Curated annotation (Swiss-Prot):
GO terms for biological process: L-histidine catabolic process to glutamate and formamide; L-histidine catabolic process to glutamate and formate. It comes from Bacillus velezensis (strain DSM 23117 / BGSC 10A6 / LMG 26770 / FZB42) (Bacillus amyloliquefaciens subsp. plantarum). It catalyses: 4-imidazolone-5-propanoate = trans-urocanate + H2O. GO terms for cellular component: cytoplasm. This is Urocanate hydratase. The active site is at 407. Its EC number is 4.2.1.49. PROSITE patterns: UROCANASE (PS01233).
Length: 554
């Protein structure tokens, strides 16, 4: 597999392998997901998030490549859990690819049934952006994580994390954004990770500053930085279920506690306490049922430590990996006594249609991204928080794979930025087209009662219709590719979510697509929250002339 691993890299420049730029964009982003700079285990087709994959197997991957190369401008390719299953003639304004990943009928929507289907070669776990081919490395979640810690700082620490110590765990593709997000907010963070290669990857990409296997050394570094008021991120090799209790026993003062281990998947994603990686691999292979049982017991112990830190005065929140649910299932009655990050810090942004707008340069030239950075500042001169974010990103973010950028934009802003990017492609200021997409974690694209839709005002946490409607409206609006997934972030049975990507190739057709998609997509977030009774969302809908047939009187 080593040769395959080395060979997967997105094309650059303006030479096409496909029959059009939309198809070429899909091919490049598929390959970009498996670039060794981007993916966690490219040799196994794993992009991030435990077993979040880009394709079901290598035969399916190569069949997708072949299909994309022959796909015409009026055809649509269908992907079922990472496998190409059909190609139909549609029309030029339809999506070029439609994807459904790991979607199970509700009664059967659990890990046991999923793994049974996976063993038979019938299904693949797509996570969120792994199976939808728009993952851009840890930067993809970076601004959302940064904004979460920034809001936490505003609520609890006077607007800055300077002089505070954060304790977290998990430095995979998503969790890897945590160290840099904390230091961008001037704080100190110890991030516990059981896999040393993951710590090394975050250090190589400048997301984490230092690593150690010694708790004593980590605490010395952290205290020195905290006392000096300097930001510092430390990757600590260890198991959170053990390390956290050791810190409690020592009476270490922690200001903030969260977690981004892959607790959503107790078999593949989480390492039980007391096991090395090698021992865990053997146990997983030989006794998977015992492994899951031990893994869940460790998660309970992990959450018990988080609750103990809360009792000692720390600000504690769940970062969307469903670890509270696992602990509750193991008998921990108060597992949900600390909130999830969305109701605590992010939902007000969702009510404005704000969410993770991202784009990647198909040219492969970083200068194309820097030009779009400048464009963003030109379009939104009054948004100083956005300017600060772009300045920090330019200084601190290392591109992984194709150069890309992430920023949170709201309703109206996304369309404005998308159309302006398309114009830069049209007039030749950019060397090649740009792909514009987002995380599935967005204002109107997810149903996830333990994460994005936790504690909705009207109790509609588990209503899955909204995620389906998001996929449908993006398809009707003509996104270049649209995806619908199950289980991302929080695991089987706990989420439904949709994604979209649109290609800015400078054409009039692209302009029309972008205008429709980048309006209706964030608009879904506004109508979803307005329907749930959020005053801010209803206000934005009224201000923006968004038609809601049965809008509630304000």
């Amino acid at each position: 597999m080593t040769d395959v691993k080395k060979s997967i890299r997105a094309g650059r420049g303006t030479e096409l392998e496909c029959l059009g730029w939309e198809q070429e964009a899909v091919l490049r982003m598929l390959r970009n997901n498996l670039d060794p700079e981007v993916a966690e285990k490219p040799e196994d087709l794993i992009v991030y998030g435990g077993i979040g994959k880009a394709a079901r197997n290598w035969d399916a991957f190569h069949a997708i490549e072949r299909s994309l190369k022959m796909l015409k401008d009026d055809e649509t390719l269908l992907i079922q859990s990472g496998k190409p299953v059909g190609l139909f003639r549609t029309h030029s304004r339809a999506p070029r690819v439609l994807l459904a990943n790991s979607v199970l009928v509700p009664k059967w929507a659990d890990w046991e049934h999923f793994h049974d289907l996976e063993k038979k070669g019938l299904m693949m776990y797509g996570q969120m952006t792994a199976g939808s081919w728009i993952y851009i490395g840890s930067q993809g979640i970076l601004q959302g994580t940064y904004e979460t810690f920034a809001e936490l700082a505003r609520q609890h620490f006077g607007g800055s994390l300077k002089g505070t110590l954060t304790l977290t765990a998990g430095l995979g593709g998503m969790g890897g954004a945590q160290p840099l997000s904390v230091t961008m907010n001037d704080g100190v963070v110890i991030a516990v990770e059981a896999d040393e290669t993951r710590i090394d990857k975050r250090i190589e990409t400048n997301y984490c500053d230092r690593k150690t296997a010694s708790i004593d050394e980590a605490l010395r570094w952290a205290e020195a930085a905290r006392q000096a008021g300097e930001p510092l991120s430390i990757g600590l090799l260890g198991n959170a279920a053990e390390v956290h209790h050791e810190l409690l026993n020592r009476g270490v003062h922690i200001d903030i506690v969260t977690d981004q281990t892959s607790a959503h998947d107790p078999l593949i994603g989480y390492i039980p306490a007391g096991y090395s990686l090698e021992e865990a691999d053997r146990l997983r292979r030989d006794q998977p049922e015992l492994y899951v049982r031990l893994s869940k017991q460790s998660m309970k112990k992990h959450v018990e430590a988080m609750l103990a830190f809360k009792k000692k005065g720390a600000v504690v929140f769940d970062y969307g990996n469903n670890i509270r649910q696992a602990a509750k299932d193991e008998g921990l009655a108060d597992a949900f006594d600390f909130p999830g990050f969305v109701p605590a810090y992010i939902r007000p942004l969702f009510c404005e249609g704000k969410g993770p707008f991202r784009w990647a340069a198909l040219s492969g030239d970083p200068e194309d991204i820097y030009r779009t950075d400048a464009l963003l500042k030109e379009l939104f001169p009054e948004n100083q928080a956005l300017h600060r974010w772009i300045d920090m990103a330019q200084k601190k973010v290392t591109f992984q794979g194709l150069p890309s950028r992430i920023c949170w934009l709201g309703y109206g802003e996304r369309e404005k930025m998308g159309l302006a990017i398309n114009e830069l492609v049209r007039n030749g200021e950019l060397k090649a087209p740009i792909v514009i997409g987002r995380d599935h974690l967005d204002c109107g694209s997810v149903a996830s009662p333990n994460r994005e839709t936790e504690a909705m005002k009207d109790g509609s946490d588990a209503v899955g219709d909204w995620a389906v409607l998001n996929a449908l409206i993006n398809t009707a609006s003509g996104a270049s590719w649209v995806s619908f997934h199950h289980g991302g972030g929080v695991g089987m049975g706990y989420s439904l979510h949709a994604g979209m990507v649109a290609v800015a190739d400078g054409s009039i057709l692209a302009e029309q697509r972008l205008s429709r998609v980048l309006t209706s997509d964030p608009g879904m977030g506004i109508i979803r929250h307005a329907d749930a009774g959020y005053e801010k969302a209803a206000q934005v809908a009224e201000e923006q002339d968004i038609m809601i047939p049965m809008k509630k009187e304000r």
